[in-house]
């Protein structure tokens, strides 16, 4: 039910990911989160304790926040947190991703004032740059495959 609300709130954006592990649900924005951190802080702990899972005892990370209601979930997701919930508990864990190639100053627009970020070859990094500046649930992206030979992923 929470995931359906989030999917509706984020307007079916393609980087909103959902996984279910042993009655525990995991939701995160792929463009803002590190898959390595998700594996280390969340997935390893959930898959090791298959019989009896208590979220409060099994999730570790640099910043874990226990939530009481639905209101602040989108704020946390847009700031690089993953949502972990089951029937009893709901919490977020910081799994903010690191940028792959450094974001450089654009060479073609050297006289423009303001932030000096530029896009690179990674779709996820570019989405992350946009979503870190524009923290809104109605910012939606959709993935496509273009080209007959190269089949490039565009968003």
Model features per residue range: what roles?
Residues 1-155:
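Membrane-embedded alpha-helical signal segments
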């Amino acid at each position: 039910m929470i995931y359906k609300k989030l999917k509706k709130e984020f307007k079916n954006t393609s980087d909103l990911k959902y996984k279910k592990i042993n009655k525990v649900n995991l939701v995160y924005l792929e463009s803002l989160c590190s898959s390595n951190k998700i594996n280390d802080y969340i997935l390893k702990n959930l898959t090791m304790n298959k019989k009896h899972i208590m979220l409060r005892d099994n999730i570790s990370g640099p910043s874990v926040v226990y939530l009481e209601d639905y209101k602040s979930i989108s704020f946390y997701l847009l700031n690089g947190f993953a949502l972990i919930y089951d029937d009893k508990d709901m919490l977020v864990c910081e799994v903010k991703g690191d940028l792959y190639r450094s974001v450089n100053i654009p060479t073609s627009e050297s006289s423009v004032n303001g932030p000096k970020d530029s896009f690179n070859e990674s779709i996820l990094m570019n989405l992350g740059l946009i979503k870190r500046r524009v923290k809104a649930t109605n910012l939606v992206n959709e993935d496509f495959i273009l080209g007959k030979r190269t089949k490039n992923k565009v968003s």
